[in-house]
Amino acid sequence: LRGEVRGLPSSFRVVTSRIVNDGIGISAIVINDPEADVLVIEDCTDEYGVCVLIKGATCSMYVVSVYCRFGTALGPYLQYMENVRVKCGNTYMIMGMDANAVSPLWFSKGENLGRGRLNEANGLLLEEWILEGRMIVINEPSEWYTFSGPNGSSDIDVTLVNEAGGRFGYEWSVQPEWGVSDHNLIRIRVSLDGLVADASPSPQSARWQTRDTDWGEYMGDVKAKADVFGLAQYENVSVDEKVDLLTEWIYGANDWNMRRHTAVRTFQNEWWSVELAEKRSELRRRRHAFQRIRNAGAASLADRLQAFRDCKIEYKRMLCEAKLRCWQEFVASESNENPWGRVFKLCRGRRKPVDVCSVKVDGVYTDTWEGSVNAMMNVFFPASIDDASEIDRLKAIARPLPPDLEMDEVSDSVRRCKVRKSPGPDGIVGEMVRAVWGAIPEYMFCLYKQCLLESYFPQKWKIASLVILLKLLDRIRSDPGSYRPICLLDNLGKVLEGIMVKRLDQKLMDVEVSPYQFAFTYGKSTEDAWRCVQRHVECSEMKYVIGLNIDFQGAFDNLGWLSMLLKLDEAQSNEFGLWMSYFGGRKVYYVGKTGIVRKDVTRGCPQGSKSGPAMWKLVMNELLLALVAAGFFIVAFADDGTIVIGANSRSALEELGTRCLQLCHEWGKRVCVPVSAGKTTCILMKGHLSANRPPCIRLNGTSISYKSEVKHLGIFVAERMNFRPHFVYLRGKILGLVGCLRRVMRKSWGLGRRATCILYKGLFVACMSYGASVWFRTLRFSYASILLNRCQRLVLYASLNVCRTVSTERMQVLHGELPWDLEATRRGLLSEFRKGITPVDGDPITDEEMLGLSGSQFKELLMERLLDVWQGRWDVSEKGRLTHEFIPSVRFVRENEWMAFGLCLGYVLTGHGSMNGFLHKRGLSNTPVCMCGAPNEDVKHLLGECPLYEDLRDLNGCGLLIRNGSLDVSGALSEIGAFEKLNQFAVSLFGRRSRLMRGMRIRE
């Protein structure tokens, strides 16, 4: 469906062909063996077929799937298959194809031969290719056709192997009983005689399930094991032996108190039932009954065909209903208990594994799993180009011993260990480290103290497990730059790293540090970096201001160790020897199901380590200070830098920009981090220049690109600091999130109100409000508020049980959450209050009112003022007047959590729904007349007047009154009892109305 294979377990790996012009994927390969490594052959996967290399314990083999479309020429498919055959070479390859061609070579039945059809002509072409390419057909004669549909039967499916596969034995058979598709399933058994399984399978890290662990008992077990060995004896062993002993004690306690984590999890197929099994058997019987007499021309042929089709339709209906019912029960039990759990991850697609693809290196694709991983690792971890003699010189300098380690230092570092995160190679998670520190702090303190005294970082903690993530789904998968490496390090080693980084931060307090690095600094964020740029642009007296967004190529991966050591030496770090040990002998490995690829690391900051950010901040500080000294203004967040340059002429801008980039280039050359001329961009932030002649700023003779719109630190901005592109981007992002969660945010079932509210605030509002303090002032323009509230409408419609035609104003009140323009304003003003920024004219709270307010008082007052603004809008709005009668106060739903309604009550509260009066206005009904004869069927008529529902009506119980001949609904939601009765009345009313309408249509 739309190029995807759906309905399979999440543990299955699916590779599909490229989407063709009509949006249909035509072939796929599904791998259900979790113990196999899969390499997608990118240069042999296109619109004609799919090719993967599967590596198991005994051998590697190419698996190819080809679908030749009916009625099309075979030439392009033969060219594709020839390319695959050449690519596979002498490696075993098996190809399954729907050839839409017949031939005696693959035992097609005789009645389909000699008729001059296109499939026979294609069969002749395929025969020639098979013979020329020395391919082997492993089809065997069968009484069953490979294709058997209502319109005919034929043997059009071919299975081929190359010469390398000819040495194995095959059992090829058609299995008509295994499925109900027109294409019968084909089973192929391969006898791999003579092949021996790998005796040294890939090592797997130990993992334990920490859920429901009794940590008190766990700590007692760790302490008991440590006490058996004794602290005195522990103090006398080497550092590496201490690490091994501590790990052994933790493993013992883990095995006693927890279950080992298994990579393969099996889930019972709960939706399959006896009724489905019986219906499937009936469908097979009817299919065979039809096939037996089809060629005989029996008189009952049409009856049997119709019976087969009816049974097939019924079977599919039962399948869909069973799957949907099971999914609904799963959503109800899982998501309402934990909205961020398995259901959320399934909807977001987070559980789908990403297979390694063949990558292009110097114009040539890799053809093995190990080759692809090695090529990626060579990009992620480039070889060092540092001067070894200079490193030896630094190592030879005599240095004083570091200060004695304090218990508080270790305790603070342990406390900063993150929980519920993936562990390193040793499998020890943050929860375990905290528990071990609570059980045997003296042993851990002894270990880290000796590391500092000996200036030795244990070798075991310098080995990282590599995880390769695809940056974006639309990236070119054959490009190593499309992937992000994450190094998983041992948490015990991260504790020592934390101690080292903390001491380095204290040492840097005596060194000049640029205030314009906003990353890795307490109290600073991306929003602070953006506001700093905004203030500089607004305060600039120059006629023109441009922003240079500097891109450092592989910043963390390429940073030279020598540059870091030199900066540590300049800072006179007392732990220099420990840092030297930390950088030496580092290794990384990538584990597959059947193998492991290792590499020595001689450069860069491990992405995932605690020291990486500190090292980058230390080294980049030199560039920031140099640019400021040269008269430039720069704001940096990690490796993202924006240089703001002002001038009164184009030529001056170009001269300053070129000189600035030259400074960055020279610094990057020294620290082995080149500036990427292709990704560095320029944008005009102030002033007007000709669109046909943007500023020409060069880096080593290459002009950097000028952009009219850029994305920086997650925020889109256009020329002259216009944030309109960001609101357009937000709509697309919110729409994507809503689309993912529509599987569980349904009108008649799905997430409950509690889960919906959690996702609304924790996902949608958080996504919308990112960077709000930067762009919320733009909301004074009507276009910005309109665009932002349109984004909110997408979420509200998915969250509420109302019709699509309900206005945004009504949905905001029914949901009880601030309009997004007010929510963004609230978050922006709160951020400014925390930073001590003075309010401007038009803000809800004046400067005088802010005096003496605490943070909580300001937050409460701000919310009240914004609610008043919202109330004013609701009172004067021309839309939603019926809803205003039910809910005149915007605070009502916020103050009453029980206000959760279904679709029928949504009809009542909004006036939009299954009512002739409403439908007639929109051209969806021929008449506004009610079935009782009243001229206009609307909500008030149904609730208070229509005689068809008199026996269901309880006006007093529902809080409804008849005043002056009209229905007063203001008391309908006055208390939970009236609300529940009104809800029941609405369900009964519209249920009966639906039945009456069906009866009228039948009579007509």
Curated annotation (Swiss-Prot):
Residues 450-717 form the Reverse transcriptase domain. Gene3D superfamilies: Endonuclease/exonuclease/phosphatase. SUPFAM superfamilies: DNA/RNA polymerases (SSF56672), DNase I-like (SSF56219). PROSITE patterns: RT_POL. InterPro entries: DNA/RNA_pol_sf (IPR043502), Endo/exonu/phosph_ase_sf (IPR036691), Endo/exonuclease/phosphatase (IPR005135), RT_dom (IPR000477). Residues 853-1004 are annotated as: Nucleic acid-binding endonuclease. It comes from the Eukaryota. GO terms for molecular function: endonuclease activity; RNA-directed DNA polymerase activity. The keyword Glycoprotein does not apply. Pfam families: Exo_endo_phos_2, RVT_1. Its EC number is 2.7.7.49. It is an enzyme of class 2 (transferase). Keywords: Endonuclease, Hydrolase, Nuclease, Nucleotidyltransferase, RNA-directed DNA polymerase, Transferase, Transposable element. It catalyses: DNA(n) + a 2'-deoxyribonucleoside 5'-triphosphate = DNA(n+1) + diphosphate. This is Retrovirus-related Pol polyprotein from type-1 retrotransposable element R1. It comes from Bradysia coprophila.
